[in-house]
Regions:
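N-terminal acidic leader/helix
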Residues: 1-30
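Small/flexible residues
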Residues: 4, 43, 66, 71-72
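Positively charged, polar, low-complexity stretches
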Residues: 29-32, 68-74
C-alpha cells in the first residue's frame, strides 16, 4: 500500500499539521473517497507529518490534487 506524507517543520509544526489534517479529511469527504488511514505522526523534534494511505484507485487523484511532499510503498 502506498502512503503519502505532508511534512511540517518548526515550533508550530504540530498545530499546522493538525490543521492540514482537518482539511485533508474534508477533501476526502467532499470527494466521496472511502475511509482510509489518515493521521499525524511525529518525525522528531520540530517535525510533524500528516499521512494518508489511499486505495490504488484514489492515489493519482490525491497525488495530483494535494501534491504530497513524499510517499512510501509498504
Amino acid at each position: 500500500m502506498k502512503s503519502f506524507f505532508w511534512d511540517f517543520f518548526g515550533p508550530r509544526a504540530e498545530g499546522t499539521a493538525q490543521h492540514f489534517l482537518l482539511h485533508l479529511r474534508e477533501f476526502l469527504s467532499k470527494n466521496q473517497c472511502p475511509e482510509m488511514p489518515t493521521g499525524l505522526r511525529s518525525e522528531g523534534v520540530g517535525h510533524q507529518a500528516v499521512f494518508c494511505s489511499p486505495p490504488l484507485e484514489y492515489q493519482a487523484a490525491i497525488e495530483r490534487s494535494l501534491r504530497p511532499r513524499r510517499s512510501t510503498e509498504e
